[in-house]
């Protein structure tokens, strides 16, 4: 496989004698030489990548290619980390934007614009099926039908999931995702359609709930939720099913379990799930 970094943004080629000299040192077998060279090239950031790609393509030794790959991965990781920290510092960050940034942890190429177009097409397809006269329950039935019947999205269980099934870009492209990934996709789509649907803190599962706007002003916890959506299947269910589940796992119906999770909480939870799966499977993400 050819190792290339497809960068959508325009990256200027650096005509810097120091960078050229540093790159020539990459074939030095001495690790004591490589470490400071590695750190200095990384400081150039994305500007160094065109030259690094050229070195990778023309390298005669596999060891040199491995070194170049490690530098490029480090540059990418630091760029993603910087953008993610900026996202986290916002008072009300957008969930969709956060997941777009983190998509590059697994995919080296920047697919942002392609994924934006895919999401917009999905939003439009769902919007065409909705109208203002539908009840919230009817609206969710329409959304579920569009996703799981028309668009043919499919959920997979934890035993068969791969790390790719967590990432929003892969789910949009392949139409397959795990419970968490599909749940986040559905919540994002609901937000774009101005539908009231939020991820909840119910232990052990990822479930979406639709709060009753009027009831939620007066009541809390389970009493404020009208119905629930299973992101793996798109099925809607009610209070009786969630109460049965809570009895099975021996959990009380605490109010906090039925409060919506916000973007920062969801992304941090998602990151923990991805890290856990990467450790279990040995899949490589940028680090």
Label every PLM stretch briefly:
Residues 10-287:
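A structural boundary/capping signal
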